[in-house]
Amino acid sequence: MQRHAIVLAAGKGTRMKSKKYKVLHDVAGKTMIEHVADNVKQSGIDQLVTIVGHGADSVKETLGDTSLYSFQEEQLGTAHAVKMASEHLSESQGTTLVVCGDTPLITTATLKSLVEHHENNQAHATVLSATAENPFGYGRILRDSEGRLVSIVEQKDATDAEQQINEISSGIFAFDNQVLFEKLELVKNDNAQSEYYLPDVLSLILEDRGIVEVFHTNDFEEIMGVNDRVMLSEAEKAFRKRINEQHMKNGVTIIDPVTTYIGADVRIGEDTVVEPGVKLSGNSVIGEDTVIGQHTEITNSKIGSNVTIKQSVINEAIVDDYATIGPFAQLRPGADLGKKVKVGNFVEVKKSVVKAGAKLPHLSYIGDAEIGERTNVGCGSITVNYDGINKFKTVIGDDSFIGCNTNLVAPITLGNRSFIAAGSTITDNVPEDSLALARARQTTKEGYLKK
């Protein structure tokens, strides 16, 4: 049986009070629409259609060709939004899942279970429900004396008694596709908001003695919609808690989960320790037995095993096993550190390969460079890589020693076992096994201040 999905993402989100389209706000390092689309696709969907309106181009740019798109010019309600997908799905057979684009906490497992329940019961429609402590704003699930669904009533149309019901509609549904588009033609806007409600499709199915099921989730957080900045913060908090708990169950020690921010796509190996105030984001991969020190930020980077990082910023970099980083080091895009490399305090590395065993202990800038194995770069040493127009490369061979306060003016190559005297400004290549000294001879005038 074919499975389709429609993601509703046409609302402007005025309560967010933002120039940014609502579903493009981030939760746990990814936009809400990406979270929803990823989980929908992973639930076994063959075809995804996203309904766009305000900010359509931005949504298309975010999801790319992973989805088809239908445009809703006027926002006339959820049934009207779903109807826009008829250009892609009206002739299709099978099951169609309808999900709101502002529900980033919905899981693949719940969506799979919803669809399976729907298909196993040969239902024409199934609604995902939950129990809310505060159901205000949600449609209420109305059942008869035998517990069967009677209808879903929206907040503004509910009586006082109906508003006391705490079983709510999530706004997530599974439908028989042909029945869905047949009934959408019959939906009217006779309600307080003069909108075309998708839940009215369920009432129309029931009128024809069709089968409508309710699938209940015990986790209200999953179906929580995000309509303003407060709810965005709540979603972030819930997502962070979920992510951190999963890592801890997988063998990662997180000292203070409340202050630890780990993105949804980050992977961490067993017995790694994450200290308070750490932020790990993007597609970062952390190995085993590594210590990520407090207030470290790692983005889209690969960190090996048995690495120690103290209070540093690492972005789009690679760090091999047994390396030590920081405190207060910065690895910028293109930094590639080999095994047992040391990058100390106030060292910045950009677009450079630092080979195994090399040491950059403190106060250095290494840019557009290649540092050989076991080479030591002294305090205050700089690769002078930019002439105001172009960047140039510095190459330092293996087992070399760069004295303190040295300037290496690129393009330049220092051979293996080079020895550069402290305080030198080196502008010419240095052959291997050579000493280079480029500084003025010291002049001392004794008794000068007594004159």
From Swiss-Prot:
GO terms for cellular component: cytoplasm; membrane. It holds the Pfam family NTP_transferase. GO terms for molecular function: glucosamine-1-phosphate N-acetyltransferase activity; magnesium ion binding; UDP-N-acetylglucosamine diphosphorylase activity. Binds 1 Mg(2+) ion per subunit. Residues 1-229 are annotated as: Pyrophosphorylase. It is an enzyme of class 2 (transferase). It catalyses: alpha-D-glucosamine 1-phosphate + acetyl-CoA = N-acetyl-alpha-D-glucosamine 1-phosphate + CoA + H(+); N-acetyl-alpha-D-glucosamine 1-phosphate + UTP + H(+) = UDP-N-acetyl-alpha-D-glucosamine + diphosphate. UDP-N-acetyl-alpha-D-glucosamine binds at residues 8-11, 22, 72, 77-78, 139, 154, 227, 332, 350, 365, 376. It is found in: Cytoplasm. Acetyl-CoA binds at residues 385-386, 422, 439. The keyword Transmembrane helix does not apply. Residues 251-451 are annotated as: N-acetyltransferase. Mg(2+) binds at residues 102, 227. Keywords: Acyltransferase, Cell shape, Cell wall biogenesis/degradation, Cytoplasm, Magnesium, Metal-binding, Multifunctional enzyme, Nucleotidyltransferase, Peptidoglycan synthesis, Repeat, Transferase. In the N-terminal section; belongs to the N-acetylglucosamine-1-phosphate uridyltransferase family. In the C-terminal section; belongs to the transferase hexapeptide repeat family. Catalyzes the last two sequential reactions in the de novo biosynthetic pathway for UDP-N-acetylglucosamine (UDP-GlcNAc). The C-terminal domain catalyzes the transfer of acetyl group from acetyl coenzyme A to glucosamine-1-phosphate (GlcN-1-P) to produce N-acetylglucosamine-1-phosphate (GlcNAc-1-P), which is converted into UDP-GlcNAc by the transfer of uridine 5-monophosphate (from uridine 5-triphosphate), a reaction catalyzed by the N-terminal domain. This is Bifunctional protein GlmU. It comes from Staphylococcus saprophyticus subsp. saprophyticus (strain ATCC 15305 / DSM 20229 / NCIMB 8711 / NCTC 7292 / S-41). The gene is glmU.
